[in-house]
Amino acid sequence: MPRRRVIGQRKILPDPKFGSELLAKFVNILMVDGKKSTAEAIVYSALETLAQRSDKNALEAFEVALDNVRPTVEVKSRRVGGSTYQVPVEVRPVRRNALAMRWIVEAARKRGDKSMALRLANELSDAADNKGTAVKKREDVHRMAEANKAFAHYRW
């Protein structure tokens, strides 16, 4: 840990189409090999498809999907006296968003649909309906934390 000063988080510019910082972060997570315009095209196409399917606008549907995937608790390994315990800890808000976005992108990449935009649209619509792989991942993390609640006093 540095002794001089703590460096603050970088300010992220909102995306050009919707003006949302969350969406800009999502584009950055989806981006591969620095191809931002490709990632933006995929995300915007997926949001367009999502808006056609649901009665909400694209950004609202995206935020509902993200909200359903955000974890509140996770487990961290903690070594105490030669044995390792999975200690449940609360997830900070910035990390909640980051994990949710990462899980949605991972789940979309594993799907078997034709294009990435379609995969992403399907995963986002599943997440908005509280189903799908990303939501299952959140449920698994919550289940692990619930199962290891006995070790919560090892929190640091």
From Swiss-Prot:
A Gene Ontology cellular-component term: small ribosomal subunit
Pfam families referenced in this protein's UniProt entry, alphabetically: Ribosomal_S7 (PF00177)
GO terms (BP aspect): translation
CDD domains found in the cross-reference section: uS7_Bacteria
Keyword Ribosomal protein included in the entry's annotation: yes
Molecular-function GO terms, alphabetical: rRNA binding; structural constituent of ribosome; tRNA binding
Keyword tags: Ribonucleoprotein, Ribosomal protein, RNA-binding, rRNA-binding, tRNA-binding
Role, per record: One of the primary rRNA binding proteins, it binds directly to 16S rRNA where it nucleates assembly of the head domain of the 30S subunit. Is located at the subunit interface close to the decoding center, probably blocks exit of the E-site tRNA.
Subunit structure: Part of the 30S ribosomal subunit. Contacts proteins S9 and S11.
Family: Belongs to the universal ribosomal protein uS7 family.
Name of the molecule in the record: Small ribosomal subunit protein uS7
Native source organism of the sequence: Enterobacter sp. (strain 638)
